[in-house]
């Protein structure tokens, strides 16, 4: 792999939409070259982006926002595969102790979490008019741990109003069984180890800025209006 160190440095400065500073224009062709090479080698593509076009037409979240969001998600998939390719090559060259390897290894979890969180998020949307069955095990667990559904929803909403970029995840502690609304900074800060993600809401600006400007509360209302509760309840093992 030619000029690997330059490509690695280029990757460190690449961005996905609204995520980080743009790539240096002189290094961009190298990153594109490596991405093109990996696209031609199926063995370097273990992850493929899912199609969520069925969500288009959702009330409260525009097609413009969704299409932009889909492209961003596809970028995380591409970068995850690209990182795997670079890390594999660095390992083959015996460069595991190099700063490039160590920084890209650190970056991998950020990109990978960006893939999986988006997949969980898109998958729990598309349920216009859907309601949580009050007799379901999930609803009963919510009442047990928060007192009422409304108290849980308020806590989830207020968690989504925390300043910063990230996610809100309703986690289940698989050992204690407890439900916990959790703030995730960016993609990788604050996850509950071993936790089971039940409901996921994206609160990066790209999820709502085009439709709601800085009105995050309006976006959160639209999110709840479109939750696919059938999918969410299936994530809860009871």
Feature map (PLM): residue ranges:
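Bacterial N-terminal signal peptides
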Residues: 6-16
